[in-house]
Amino acid sequence: LSGDLKAVFKDRGDDSQYHPAELFYFLGQKKVSIPLKIKTRGNFRKSASNCKYPPLMLNFPNSEVMDNTLFSGQNKMKLVTPCQGDEYTVNEYLVYKLYNLFSPQSFQGQLLKISFQDTLKRKKARTYYGLLLENENQMAQRNQALLFEKIGYQPTQLDKVKFLEMAVFE
């Protein structure tokens, strides 16, 4: 992931903005490049006092540049970045996989190695484990469900078993 990452990682307010970036990956020997926009997201991990690298929202372009890429058909995806180090990121990935065994109404995650390269610095890229999460709309569609934006549901308003399954993993 390449761009003015210093500006991105400093933009941690409630109203963080999208910044231009470029995502590179290798498909065999071929280097694939996708221009995109990224911004910080989250709550606890978004704070600089808690995490050096805040979680990111990846906003992919809706264009032919996405055709025949690993991210074809994607719009926005959440990227969990290393907060407490690689071990915690790998453990979080395993928790997602465990939750997937309990319920299909859970997010699919993909563990990956991610390198951060700030285009304004001449430092070597740093590589960490990251976790890419499926889009909310994809999870809802996969489960023939609808998304609701309401915040503050009471446990008594929800399916008891599903709520308790979720609570174990929250």
Report the location of each language-model feature.
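Phosphate/dinucleotide-binding and metal-coordinating scaffold of catalytic cores
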Residues: 1-170
